[in-house]
Amino acid sequence: MDSSPDLRTRIAEFLSQDLPATNKQGEAAIAMAAGHEGEPELPGTYVDYEAGPREYELAVAQTILRVHTRVADLYNGPMDQLEQQLRLTVEALRERQEWEMLNNRDFGLLHNADSRQRIHTRSGPPTPNDMDELLSRRRNTRLFLAHPRAIAAFFRECNSRGLYPASADVDGHHVPAWRGVPIFPCGKIPVTDQATTSILAMRTGLEEQGVIALHQTGLPDEREPGLSVRFMGVSDQAIARYLVSTYFSAAVLVPDALGVLENVELGHA
């Protein structure tokens, strides 16, 4: 630091700032008095959820769908060609949205778990003990999210111990579960070249102070919540163009809403 006057100046400026008081979790402190006698003047306070609250900017996924007017005019039976192509386009955008909500460096869940909510496997493969520790880090865990190969690796560990996990009923469908918490497969969770991956556990919903999805409703030409289809006109080649856009993000309302089991070994393919 002695060799860099600019760095020394910036550090001195930072240390001289009047930073807001925080508790040991880094949350904005609430001023209070306790154990006093007589009639002292009580402190006043504003309740700030965080000393420096984060602002989320909605991400966007977009594409331009091109449909030749001849196709729309002549081949609309028995299926509406425009509607079918829009359906496929929307599905592709939703798939990309899911990938971004997991892997985006800014707001993706894999990159936004608190360091205290990240744990490593005990021996490599995902064992029942690992899943129990991941589960114990939060209240009201709603779901696990894991790569299909990670689920298979976990079941192998259960079988080797003579354990047979039950299933959970979700909207009339039976899905794998552990301790009554459903395990949903997700192929968008990355697998490294060393055949390792991660397993997520989360509490969801605004009322539960969990993980929530963010989107904007009331868009012009809205087709679904947070997704719009805007007609851009017809080109000189008689090709109709539609701008398909979806806006989204994700937020972890409190640190213990999301946990990640890291370095999960999948074994041999």
Residue ranges and their predicted role:
Residues 48-73, 84-92, 101-104, 199-208, ...:
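A glycine- and small-residue-enriched flexible loop/hinge signal that marks low-structured segments
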Residues 1-65:
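Assembly/oligomerization interface modules of large self-assembling protein complexes
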Residues 63, 140-142, 179, 240:
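Structural beta-strand/beta-sheet cores of well-ordered domains, especially the beta-sheet scaffolds
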Residues 113-177:
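Extended, solvent-exposed, turn-rich assembly/linker loops in the middle of proteins
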Residues 62-140:
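Alpha-helical scaffold segments that mediate packing/assembly in large oligomeric complexes
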Residues 71, 95, 150-152, 189, ...:
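Short loop/turn segments at secondary-structure transitions that flank enzyme active sites
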Residues 166-269:
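Sequence/fold signature of self-assembling virion shell proteins
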Residues 1-4, 8, 75, 124, ...:
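Intrinsic-disorder-associated interaction segments
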